Each structure stands twice: as structure tokens, then as C-alpha cells.
């Protein structure tokens, strides 16, 4: 009788163990599936990289939904910035945003220079208007600083030289999901041998040998949404309180009307 009870107990433990292991594997499968979905969602945009001639976007269709008015061809918005904290509590950030209207085949935006303090006092922000013609950035505002002027006129978006054909090789990412928004995040370790990392090191002052982290963020439906948002960040930060990163995004939305501006 005692032996039969032990057998029943033993079988119960085995069944419980299998159930726990099965749940664990199920969670792993779900996380792997979400990782693949996030990569697939980004691939729709990243497969377009590198976009050496930004004017190609005038003829490039994006994801369309009910937010688009009839006849609206939409607008591509491309963005790149470089953020660096040289001093504790202070963040220096420079970059450009450009809106390419497919209806008018015109591209306008601005180059920004920000200095942001933790307490927000003495924070500084300056925008310089730009437009693009014949794939060339044209500065519309007067800039006295010759070095800054050259940086603006020679600026290249990350999407113009980035190449993510090997996106599938980024594996075992740290995936987090906020179903209330919804939003999705995935982080992948990169190698200093990665061509994208080499490109960034050649273009920006990155005083660390630390291999960066690739961060993908999506707000909205994974399948696509004109009101959603995708952001790519390559983070070289050495410590939690320091910042050294490049942020890139390319999004397709309804074109802005003059009344909206």
C-alpha cells in the first residue's frame, strides 16, 4: 500500500514537471514568435535600405489604411539623430528630420541642435530649415558657424548607408511587450565587425570600443499602421547614466495639409 502511494506521488511529480517545462517552452516559443514578428515588421522598412537617393521615396508606396484621404499619396518622414552626454546631466543631440511629400514631390524639414539639461533649465534648442532638391540638402537659414553649416549641407541619414540584409542573423533578442499601447521592443547584441557599426564609427565621434546594442521599438500594430511609429536605435552607451546612441526612423503617413501645420 505504501509502495503504491509512492508510485502515485512519483507519477504526479513527473506530470507536474512536464507541465512546468512545457509551459516554459511555450513561453520561449511565444517570445521567439514575437521576435520574428518584430523583425518582419521592421524588415518591411529596412529592406529598402540603403536608400542612396532619397528622391526614390517619391515613387515608393508605403502601408495604407483608412487614415488616408482619397487621392493622398502619403508622405515619408525620415529621421536620424546622434545623442551624446559629454557631461553628467547634460545631453547634446544633433540630427535632421525630412518630410518627403509624394503628392507634391517636395522635401522639407530641419536640422536640429539640442542641449538638454536634466532639470530642463538652460536647455537649448535650435532648428535650421532645410529642403532637398536633386538628392542634395539645401540650407534655407543663415548659419554663421562654418563647421555647423558643413555638417548640415553634407548630412547623410542612417538609412542612406545602412544595410540590414542580414537582419535575420540577429537572434536571441530580449523582447518586451506592452499590450495596453500596444508597443513592442526588441534588443539584440551587435558586433563591432558589423558593417553598420563600422559606418557609424567612421561618421561620428564614438570614443568607446564597446559593441553596441540594436534596439527596435514599435508603437501600434505589428502588421502596420499609418498612426503607428517605428524607431531603430544603435546604443553605444558604456554605463546606465551615460548616453551615446544613434536613432533612426522611416515612417509613412498621410501627407500633412497646410491647415495642419
UniProtKB/Swiss-Prot annotation:
Q: Where in the cell is it found?
A: Cell membrane
Stored InterPro entries: Csa, Csa_sf
Can the keyword Iron-sulfur be found in this entry's annotation? no
* Lipid-binding residues (covalent, S-diacylglycerol cysteine): 23
Q: Which GO terms describe its cellular component?
A: plasma membrane
Q: Name one Pfam family in it.
A: DUF576
In the UniProt record, the signal sequence range is 1-22
Query: Could you tell me what this protein is called?
Result: Uncharacterized lipoprotein SAV0440
User: Which species?
Assistant: Staphylococcus aureus (strain Mu50 / ATCC 700699)
Amino acid at each position: 500500500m505504501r509502495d503504491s502511494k509512492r508510485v502515485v506521488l512519483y507519477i504526479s511529480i513527473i506530470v507536474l514537471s512536464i507541465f512546468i517545462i512545457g509551459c516554459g517552452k511555450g513561453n520561449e516559443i511565444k517570445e521567439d514568435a514575437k521576435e520574428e514578428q518584430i523583425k518582419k515588421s521592421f524588415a518591411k522598412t529596412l529592406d529598402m535600405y540603403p536608400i542612396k537617393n532619397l528622391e526614390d521615396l517619391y515613387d515608393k508606396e508605403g502601408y495604407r489604411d483608412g487614415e488616408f484621404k482619397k487621392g493622398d499619396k502619403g508622405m515619408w518622414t525620415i529621421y536620424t539623430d546622434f545623442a551624446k552626454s559629454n557631461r553628467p546631466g547634460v545631453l547634446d543631440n544633433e540630427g535632421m528630420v525630412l518630410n518627403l511629400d509624394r503628392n507634391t514631390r517636395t522635401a522639407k524639414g530641419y536640422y536640429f541642435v539640442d542641449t538638454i539639461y536634466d532639470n530642463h533649465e538652460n536647455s537649448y534648442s535650435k532648428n535650421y530649415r532645410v529642403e532637398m532638391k536633386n538628392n542634395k540638402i539645401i540650407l534655407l537659414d543663415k548659419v554663421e558657424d562654418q563647421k555647423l553649416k558643413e555638417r548640415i549641407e553634407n548630412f547623410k541619414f542612417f538609412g542612406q548607408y545602412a544595410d540590414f540584409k542580414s537582419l535575420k542573423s540577429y537572434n536571441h533578442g530580449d523582447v518586451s511587450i506592452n499590450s495596453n499601447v500596444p508597443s513592442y521592443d526588441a534588443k539584440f547584441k551587435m558586433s563591432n565587425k558589423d558593417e553598420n557599426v563600422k559606418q557609424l564609427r567612421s561618421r561620428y565621434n564614438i570614443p568607446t570600443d564597446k559593441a553596441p546594442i540594436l534596439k527596435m521599438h514599435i508603437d501600434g500594430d505589428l502588421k502596420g499602421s499609418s498612426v503607428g511609429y517605428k524607431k531603430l536605435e544603435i546604443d553605444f552607451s558604456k554605463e546606465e547614466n551615460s548616453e551615446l546612441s544613434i536613432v533612426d526612423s522611416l515612417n509613412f503617413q498621410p501627407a500633412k495639409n497646410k491647415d495642419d501645420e
